[in-house]
Amino acid sequence: PNILKGYSYVNIEDNRLHPMELNKLAQDSAIGLSGVQYKFAVNLDHKKKEIQFTDNKNDIYFIKPYNKQRCTFKGRGNNDNYIPYLLINEHLFMTMARDFGFDIPYNAIVKEGVDYHYIIKRYDNYAGIKFDHTDFLTFIGKSSKHKYDIKFNELKKHVFDLINEDDMLDLYKFLVFSVIIGHGDLHAKNLSLIYKSSSLYEKELRLSPFYDIATTKIYGKNVDSRDIGLNIASRVKKFFNRKDLIEVAGNMSIDKALAESIIDKYALRFLNDFKNLYVDTLSNEIKSLPFYRLKGYRTADTLEVVLLRYLEKRRKDIKKYLEVEIKKEEEKTTAQMLFE
């Protein structure tokens, strides 16, 4: 993980990081992951270790502050809005996606108070030159309230003819990756196409870098726990199986044997690498962050335990639904992984 240590905030007051009206909204309504995101432009100076608020349209970084209400657990009362460490979650899976070979913008986390803010580099602005991009939902011609309701045939009709074979394969790989990690908040506004150049005469569209990647599987009943938010199967379903992903490949003109190999390769890599390369490499401070249970006595686990429990559950689901062959000795419990 890329943790910015020793950085100071310049011209960024607390009310900009944590707007009172946003905290009030989070406190009063259960709006899931999509409604949590808030960001503003910053300048990132690595030499001075400064994060500075800016209204310069050419600055190339955004900061997404954590929401105080989302990481506050109430010992008594309603915790429907308890979605802690979302930005650590996002940074972790953005890093994994990058390592899997996907085009991912630079991103990092920086501590402030009880949680971490998230910084990401814009992919549509290079040295002040803007590259126009359009999300899939806009191509389809629907409003934001329909971002989870898009049918696969709509993608096929309005988007797939606009991209080349290489990008189509990358998109399929990303859909498989998203199912494997449980990216339940993937929707039609989280995927976009960008023009290859900034020329007024440019007509070629390419798949944009991927962004807003996180697992919803660690938040229990407080968020939609589907394997993937985008409706790419023949019907809405919580768990995607191997047959679903092979059917999607066929609809994207991707060879069945290639699709089979992608499913197996990505699933096994995720299962083999998640603990060693992503959980174990977190700082002890992050691993020991308290993560409260929503059921039972509402005791707190650590973030490390929650992530390992998630891995154990994903291993079972991947074996059951994606029919990936997993060696018996690799089927470890959370406790076994914790004390390795």
Model-predicted segments: where are they?
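Phosphate/dinucleotide-binding and metal-coordinating scaffold of catalytic cores
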Residues: P1-E340
